[in-house]
């Protein structure tokens, strides 16, 4: 995956730097801190979206934090772990047009609900199917679960853009940076909580030891 990033980043960055024109800079508008706090406490839709982003970030973060352990310890396929994780993200990228079409058809909030239910169903389906050495199940889970990976964060940010536009219509001020800074915070908090909670539960409740000998109960805790 490291070589993948080293090769693709320059190939993608150079055309952007050469052919995408710079936009004309606009003078910034300072927002008094009192007004900023009023925005934070008065906008209920924003809070609902932040809670949704925190929860979605937590769920996706747990899956991401445990994936390598699942591939190496439970499936005992360490040689597949890194390349499968690469396809996990690649599938999420390629599936995004389908989720966007669904969002246009049923609404962004409903599309996100479908994506979360889909990912939950894939996780539940893994429980009876997972077994050591089963390459088909590992790759099937990776591709199918990865197809929904990008939907929640993308749709949530699209909805936050709508909230930012509504705020501009009501107040006459442009402050998308404030909204998206909060969204970035909840996303990072969700991912951090996911890593801390999942690793702590694995150690205390299941006595899982990374890279060591684990009994079936400890391995089952990964799922």
Task: Please name every model-derived segment.
Residues 1-223:
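Membrane-embedded alpha-helical bundles of multi-pass transporters/translocases
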């Amino acid at each position: 995956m490291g070589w993948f990033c080293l090769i693709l980043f320059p190939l993608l960055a150079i055309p952007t730097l050469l052919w995408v024109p710079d936009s004309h800079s606009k003078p910034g508008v300072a927002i008094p801190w009192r007004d900023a706090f009023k925005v934070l406490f008065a906008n209920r839709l924003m809070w609902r979206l932040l809670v949704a982003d925190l929860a979605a970030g937590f769920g996706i973060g747990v899956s991401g934090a445990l994936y390598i352990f699942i591939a190496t310890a439970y499936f005992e396929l360490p040689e597949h772990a890194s390349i499968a994780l690469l396809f996990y993200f690649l599938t999420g990228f390629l599936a995004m047009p389908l989720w966007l079409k669904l969002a246009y058809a049923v609404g962004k909030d409903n599309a996100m609900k479908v994506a979360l239910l889909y990912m939950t169903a894939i996780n539940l389906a893994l429980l009876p199917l997972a077994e050591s050495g089963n390459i088909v199940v590992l790759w099937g889970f990776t591709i199918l679960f990865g197809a929904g990976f990008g939907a929640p964060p993308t749709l949530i940010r699209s909805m936050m853009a709508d909230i930012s536009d509504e705020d501009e219509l009501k107040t006459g001020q442009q402050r998308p940076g404030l909204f998206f800074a909060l969204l970035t915070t909840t996303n990072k908090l969700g991912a951090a909580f996911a890593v801390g909670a999942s690793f702590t539960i694995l150690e205390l409740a299941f006595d899982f030891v990374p890279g060591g000998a684990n009994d079936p109960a400890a391995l089952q805790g990964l799922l």
